[in-house]
């Protein structure tokens, strides 16, 4: 059986209100098929944060994993950059 490589995404934390769960906004650019203009697209992912270490504004790296719940199938790998303290 062939082993598949897990998908990794990098994004910004937009919500940390849930216990052990963060919402990560992942942005990407893609080219419009007809006009050729680059368009910014985004998606929100729910990720498992075991130690509740993330705060809003952090830049994080998440990896796809087994389902933790109905909508949570990603897991926090590392905090790339902490948000500036206000």
From Swiss-Prot:
Keywords: Ribonucleoprotein, Ribosomal protein, RNA-binding, rRNA-binding. InterPro entries: NA-bd_OB-fold, Ribosomal_uS17, Ribosomal_uS17_bact/chlr. One of its GO terms (molecular function) is rRNA binding. Transmembrane segments: none annotated. GO terms for cellular component: cytosolic small ribosomal subunit. Belongs to the universal ribosomal protein uS17 family. One of the primary rRNA binding proteins, it binds specifically to the 5'-end of 16S ribosomal RNA. Part of the 30S ribosomal subunit. This is Small ribosomal subunit protein uS17. It comes from Marinomonas sp. (strain MWYL1).
